[in-house]
Amino acid sequence: AEETCKVIRDCGFDMQLMLGPGLISEVNNPGCPWNKTNYSEEELKQRAERNDRNIDELIRIANENSDVINSVSVGNENTPQWGENNVPIERLISFARRLKEGTGKPVTFNEGVYEWEHLKQLADELDIISIHSYPLWNGNNVEEALEVNKTWYKKVKEWYPGKPIVFSEVGWATDCADFKQMREGQANEENQKKYYEEFWKWSDREQI
């Protein structure tokens, strides 16, 4: 992160960053399909302490690079049932408060659109709602994708009126070996181009 800030500043790039921590799990999650690790209480305590240090480091970097960093994030996809790096909501809330007090920057949290309905306690502490949307992974084709994004954006706006909402992750795969979640034939460069062009046109028009 610090090197990225330096490059932006030294090269005079007209851009700023959202800075977030690399949180690791503070709870065991048997619902994660690919990580069945059962951490001991002592290991979970050590992992929580590591997250606390990461938040402290984030505050330091944000303050030392205030001209380049425009917002700070509490975490990234730390609440889904399938998540590998889940963190209790009360801990995420405490991180949000620490970041707001420690940096003075707008505070956000990055999570999949379908999780935000259940995150009101956390959202109350945030200045910005950052959403991730991947219609292809949810079985939609490229013709449906933009309407899916519009629908989710409208829902999140209804859940949290008055909160700015940004798409912090969007994407369209160009290849996939496993089509269990995707419609076969949809992951290709042509569809990716179409998806991005339609998405940016819509988001620019709506000033999202």
Provide a role label for each language-model segment:
Residues 2-4, 53-60, 110-121, 147-155, ...:
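Alpha-helical scaffolding within the catalytic cores
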Residues 19-21, 25, 30, 69-70, ...:
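Aromatic- and acid-rich polysaccharide-binding/catalytic face
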Residues 97-101, 106, 125-208:
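Substrate-binding and catalytic surfaces of secreted/luminal carbohydrate-active proteins
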